[in-house]
Amino acid sequence: MMWLGTWKKGISYYHESIFKFSLDYVGDVTAVEEDKNGDLWIGTNNDGLIHWKINTGEPQLFVREVSDANSLSSDAVSCLLRTRDGKLWIGTLGGGLDCYDNGRFTHYKNMVKNRKSLTDNNIVALAEDKSGIVWIGTSGGGLQSLNPRTGEFNTYNTTTSDLAFNTVSSLYITRDNSLMIGTSRGLSVMDLSTKKIISLTGTKSGKTRFSNQNINQVYEDSRGLIWIATREGLNIYNPKIDELTILAEKNGLSNLLTVGIVEDDNSNMWITSAKGLTHIIPMLDSKTGMYDFRCNIYDERDGLQSSGFNQRSVKKLSSGEIVIGGVYGINRFFSDKIKYNEVLPNVFFTHFLLFNKEVEVGEVYGDKVILDKALNFVDQVELDYKQNMFCV
């Protein structure tokens, strides 16, 4: 512990375990992506797109310019995706889909008379499959795929497919080439080889339902577990045994409204919510095949930008550093440097009140001194039987 004496400002103290997360204020952060140079691209809520050069810390701002066709289509950026060819895809609210490549913006918008265009200008989620097809989740227009080479769109909605709902909130492509589609009314899964969609409300057997069907993010970890963030808790699905575990506040979750999921280099999970950050360590019982989950909670007292984080605004960088975005900027951290203090602090009494008045050291009550030294150094306190109203 480092103690600092100040001029007229009292005593300050610092320990590395107190503030665990570095903070950068860059506005209300809604999305984070990394390019091939290790630079950060940060989407904001109505403040445009920020290109943050990681080596110099210099930000470059992209905003919508009405008179400039080569500019961002909307300052409300909702999601970002860097594809394998190095292009940056930018989902916006109200402005459709942008693609940024070598200083040029290409815009994709809904055109009412063109059924092969974007179905909705509110883009919520993006993903790229192994064929280079960009998958697009919209807010009301269903799921779409875009072939960047031809500019051709294909649409999947509740009318043309078994999609659970037309508001798509999250997209994730699993190792077995399935597209996990989180919607406002359940989870859909597409086999990318056949384009067949099935929808789930819980386990395949029907034994357990998701805690809530309004899904904020879907994520597959290195174990093959499917993590599902909802408005009413975190759902963890083990497809090997068709078992669903639901974590709530009583299980150590920071808040029921979970919004973001990411796995660190140690195969542990970090979950953002409306009230803080939860670090989850999964532990496997080899006999039963079941997992137990240990949770640690962090909030503003640990250096977080605030307790509130934005939906899917979380990213693990190529360096292993994790970036999480919220209403007051981003926090960055390496999970190995977050130390959890398992030593319980000693309990100290700091005040002793007799008849609602604090007893001072050396002060005489009646004919005797009750405290001859500071309270935390006293083994016992002797009182007269009439001195029967006290508190510590």
Role assignments for model-derived ranges:
Residues 1, 77, 87, 133, ...:
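Short, intrinsically disordered, charge-balanced linker/junction segments flanking boundaries
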Residues 169, 175-176, 185-188, 213-217, ...:
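Beta-propeller domains
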Residues 9, 21-30, 34, 60, ...:
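Residue-level "micro-hotspots" composed of small/polar
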Residues 34-37, 82-85, 128-131, 172-176, ...:
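Residue-level detector of Asp-centered blade-edge/turn motifs that repeat once per structural unit
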Residues 2-4, 39-41, 87-89, 133-137, ...:
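Conserved beta-propeller blade signature
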Residues 7-11, 45-49, 93-97, 139-143, ...:
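Loop/turn residues immediately N-terminal
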Residues 1-47, 54:
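An edge-strand/N-cap motif at the start of beta-rich repeat modules
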Residues 14-18, 53-57, 100-104, 147-151, ...:
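Short loop/turn segments that connect beta-strands within beta-propeller blades
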